[in-house]
């Protein structure tokens, strides 16, 4: 689950991090009032969406009057912002954050942290190249990224934070200020089950003080049951409607931009299925894992979910029967096709537990369902059907 910038800053401020001041506005009048309250020579109006690249997409604007703040807010709120991190439809802008004047600054730094699966530890990353995408820095000048791995048994040590401060070129009081900032970030990361933390840029102001100008936080969704206050911050308007519906039925669904819907049990098999569809010249429309313990109701809902995507021109169902029985899947497929009145080609590949019985149910259903003998055959048939 992702947080908005204003939510991330509020959370980080609670752990002692110096964040750029800002006031949330839901309309032009509130934005104008926020500008007056901040009282600076200018302010920055930022669209609140769950996506990066807002500046280049026109979602971050500098304003020099209350009238301009109102005008910019009204031009953003109620629209969809399209960035390089969104799909073609973009993300809805329901509010803007009117931020205080902090510029000019001495320099802009970067500080982030992730859960490193290879080391099974939290890894902090810092760079002197703040204000630009860290992916670009990693690709062009990787030597400018400094990493610190934290032992979970002892936590982040002050000496580790000081070492990062030295590498960033900080001096005197800035070092202690940075140690406090990084320690607070680590505490927030652990206590709130972050999956991602990023401050970009971390500004060094003209007076030498540090300030978090932006804040990006991703929460491990599996931990939300023990984070009720964090769970309340969830903004469902920023999530794909079908992905949101899928979560209600414990389905793992990710929307893509192809035209071949996929229903598979098991994440690995789902990825392999998408790969072979691409190999055969097709384009998968989604990743959908119904899980190892799929029930008939979940399979029916999964089918409905796939067909709600109007770009889907065919469906490939690939089931390996282990825990789940292929005959139960076949019954669910038949029920779903009858209920929804499917008018696109459907190719089904069943292997494993009760696969023969499942194939019999499909063949005797009287419906236009194409059986496949193996994954290769299934991919070829669905690609051919869609291109026919």
Curated annotation (Swiss-Prot):
UniProt-listed Enzyme Commission number(s): 6.2.1.5
Necessary cofactors: Mg(2+)
Residues at which ATP binds: 46, 53-55, 100, 103, 108
InterPro entries recorded: ATP-grasp (IPR011761), ATP-grasp_succ-CoA_synth-type (IPR013650), ATP_grasp_subdomain_1 (IPR013815), Succ-CoA_synthase_bsu_CS (IPR017866), SUCC_ACL_C (IPR005811), Succ_CoA_ligase-like_bsu (IPR005809), Succinyl-CoA_synth-like (IPR016102)
PROSITE patterns: ATP_GRASP, SUCCINYL_COA_LIG_3
Reaction(s) the record says it catalyses: succinate + ATP + CoA = succinyl-CoA + ADP + phosphate; GTP + succinate + CoA = succinyl-CoA + GDP + phosphate
NCBIfam families: PRK00696.1, sucCoAbeta
PANTHER family, per database record: SUCCINATE--COA LIGASE [GDP-FORMING] SUBUNIT BETA, MITOCHONDRIAL (PTHR11815:SF10), SUCCINYL-COA SYNTHETASE BETA CHAIN (PTHR11815)
Protein name (database record): Succinate--CoA ligase [ADP-forming] subunit beta
Gene, per the UniProt record: sucC
């Amino acid at each position: 689950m992702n947080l908005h910038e204003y939510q991330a800053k509020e959370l980080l401020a609670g752990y002692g991090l110096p964040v750029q001041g800002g006031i949330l506005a839901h309309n032009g009048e509130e934005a104008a009032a926020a500008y007056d309250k901040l009282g600076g020579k200018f302010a920055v109006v930022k669209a609140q969406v769950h996506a990066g690249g807002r500046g280049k997409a026109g979602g971050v604007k500098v304003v020099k009057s209350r009238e301009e703040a109102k005008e910019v807010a009204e031009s953003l709120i109620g629209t969809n912002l399209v960035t390089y991190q969104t799909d073609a439809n973009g993300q809805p802008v329901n509010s803007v954050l009117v931020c205080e004047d902090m510029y000019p600054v001495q320099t802009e730094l970067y500080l982030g942290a992730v859960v490193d699966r290879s080391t099974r530890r939290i890894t902090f990353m810092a760079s002197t190249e703040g204000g630009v995408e860290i992916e670009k820095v990693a690709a062009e000048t990787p030597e400018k990224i400094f990493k610190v791995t934290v032992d979970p048994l002892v936590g982040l040590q002050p000496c580790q934070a000081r070492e990062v401060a030295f590498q960033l070129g900080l001096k005197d009081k800035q070092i202690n200020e940075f140690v406090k900032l990084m320690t607070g970030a680590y505490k927030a990361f652990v206590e709130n089950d972050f999956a991602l933390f990023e401050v970009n840029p971390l500004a060094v102001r003209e007076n030498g003080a540090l300030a978090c100008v932006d804040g990006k936080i991703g929460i491990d969704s599996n931990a939300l049951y023990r984070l009720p206050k964090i769970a309340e911050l969830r903004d469902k308007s920023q999530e794909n409607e079908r992905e949101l519906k899928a979560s209600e039925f414990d389905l793992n669904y990710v929307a893509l931009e192809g035209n071949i819907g996929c229903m598979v049990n098991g994440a690995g098999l789902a990825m392999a299925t998408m790969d072979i569809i691409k190999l055969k010249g097709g384009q998968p429309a989604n990743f959908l894992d119904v899980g190892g313990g799929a029930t008939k109701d979940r399979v029916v809902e999964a089918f409905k979910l796939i067909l709600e995507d109007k770009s889907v021109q065919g469906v490939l169902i690939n089931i390996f029967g282990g825990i789940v029985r292929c005959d139960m899947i076949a019954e669910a497929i038949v029920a779903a096709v009858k209920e929804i009145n499917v008018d696109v080609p459907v190719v089904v590949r069943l292997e494993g537990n009760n696969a023969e019985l499942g194939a019999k149910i499909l063949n005797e259903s009287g419906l236009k369902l194409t059986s496949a003998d193996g994954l290769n055959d299934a991919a070829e048939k669905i690609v051919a059907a869609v291109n026919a």
